[in-house]
């Protein structure tokens, strides 16, 4: 599942593919997808052109829509298990495209491709139930953790707490495993005990890891949907060296309450 780095790279790809001079004039939805189409009749005039820019916050991706005359609005995307964007010709639309924004010339489109169909889209804004982005809103994020240290969620095991987007928006399986390994602390302790053990170190490493993953190309474990196509051998080697715990054959693993696999050092068994 795409995590913070992969979602941010997706936003980068959209902004590189869709120039500020490019205009769009409608959308297309694959009828096989059960999610409802976007009803733009209340936010756009008939045949009104609009611009698109992307930004990310944790695991959320926002496409800001700026119409020629109507008020700006946003379309929120979650990428699901492996959704990604491409930009290409309408006539060469990828098989698993489920939603697209059509350019004015009618020949090209910004395509949301999602083989497993877990991705979602809707008109809206950032989800208030998700935490600040720890890489760009560090102070707000760390303050939120400390001010809520006695919340019932922090009484749960640390490895479960890390997957709760209410507290760490952007973390998923590989970031969880890597953070636990680098902290070198028992991941089965209550989250509040791990966090309070060395709060500054916890915050620093938790915020640094997704930034490192981003600069390594968003994780070669997702090379099949990396929109920027980072495939250089040197980057792959750097990524493999960076990854210490996730899918490490020498580590223990278990299935958590959410059905996700967690890798951890054998000494914590």
List PLM regions with ranges.
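Basic, amphipathic alpha-helical segments enriched in Lys/Arg and hydrophobic/aromatic residues
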Residues: 198-215
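Short hydrophobic "helix-edge" motifs at membrane interfaces and signal-peptide entry regions
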Residues: 49-50, 161-163, 249
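Residue-level marker of motif borders
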Residues: 54, 167-168, 254
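Hydrophobic/aromatic-lined pockets within catalytic cores
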Residues: 15, 19, 180, 184-185, ...
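Acidic, proline/glycine-enriched N-terminal capping motif
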Residues: 1-130, 262
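C-terminal accessory segment of soluble enzyme catalytic cores
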Residues: 210-269
